[in-house]
């Protein structure tokens, strides 16, 4: 016979697995549609018209039209395509289901059009809203917070292809007690995360790791080098933190989202022309291309880091629907490669992983997620102790500092983005 604690944990197991699978399938469908549209916009259409896909006019035109299209969706869709991600944390309160169609369309347009944002925030919003709405009907005795936790865990597992990130994130939020141990509370979320990760793995494998030279043995000087790299990444990230709310306030004085996003898309197009095609899109595939290109110099990596960070700020400030984690990882990789080229004595494994740790920490203010992203992009167990040590001064530097988020005006309704 199972102990009552075990039976309690099993109660939500089936819903957790179902939510994890559904979270992954929603992500897969959205990404597939966006991929097809991206191929149409950036491969087939310019080829048919006899235009180079890296033509400045094409890049500016596609991104400007993408901004206008997203603005029209936000202006006229029911629920205005959900909340502005610049004003929301990664895991937020559930939104009305009526806002989800517009949010999904806005996300797909942004991903396909080359906007420098990832899918994580809108997908999280969609999955949480559906889990809460459907779960409240099927199992009304389960509170909204439980459904929110299961949906966010399933989404994290699906996004990263592993339940490890969910385990790390929720271990700091689901505090255990003498009555309910931590792992009792983690059981159902980890079931959802595992189901999401396994479902994603059936269709594609998220490819985060980079072909960077193996790091052999940790030296004391490497800790100092890593801390300096993380501090440089944090300094760059804090510039973006300072710029985001100011640019957001300036752009949204125009009130009309079509105009705001059209201008935002035009600026992104100009940045894309300067940085080239590798500086477009969410950044995961592009960072693989960046590492594979042996022709890039220190100044090239610096330019890519600056352009991508600027594009991230512009996209978020304009109101495009997307997340900031994936493009931030690209910025970290570019910064790390730049610093390694500048000081070759410091291994690239250290510069890249510590730069990712610093910039993701600025964007998310989540130590576990920052460690996870650094560890999966540069998968080397020898680096783990160094990253844990470097995290300490990095966390001190950011203590009490503002987050990369815009404070929503009090008079503005929570989901009215007109």
UniProtKB/Swiss-Prot annotation:
Its recorded name reads: Putative ion-transport protein YfeO
Q: Which CDD domains match?
A: Voltage_gated_ClC
* UniProt xrefs under Pfam families: Voltage_CLC (PF00654)
Superkingdom to which the source organism belongs? Bacteria
Q: Does the keyword Disulfide bond apply?
A: no
Q: How does it sit in the membrane?
A: Multi-pass membrane protein
* Chief location bin: membrane
Tell me where the transmembrane regions lie: 10-30, 54-74, 99-119, 120-140, 149-169, 186-206, 223-243, 258-278, 300-320, 322-342, 343-363, 371-391
Q: Which NCBIfam families match?
A: PRK03655.1 (NF002971)
Subcellular localization(s) per the UniProt record:
Cell membrane
Can you list the disulfide-bonded cysteine pairs?
Answer: none
Q: Does the keyword Ion transport apply?
A: yes
- The organism is Escherichia coli (strain ATCC 8739 / DSM 1576 / NBRC 3972 / NCIMB 8545 / WDCM 00012 / Crooks)
Instruction: Please give the family membership noted in the entry.
Output: Belongs to the chloride channel (TC 2.A.49) family.
An MF annotation (GO) of this entry: chloride transmembrane transporter activity
Alphabetically sorted, this entry's keywords are: Cell membrane, Ion channel, Ion transport, Membrane, Transmembrane, Transmembrane helix, Transport
InterPro entries xref list: Chloride_channel_YfeO, Cl-channel_core, ClC, ClC-type_chloride_channel
Xref: PANTHER family: CHLORIDE CHANNEL PROTEIN CLC-E, ION-TRANSPORT PROTEIN YFEO-RELATED
Give an example GO cellular component term for this record.
plasma membrane
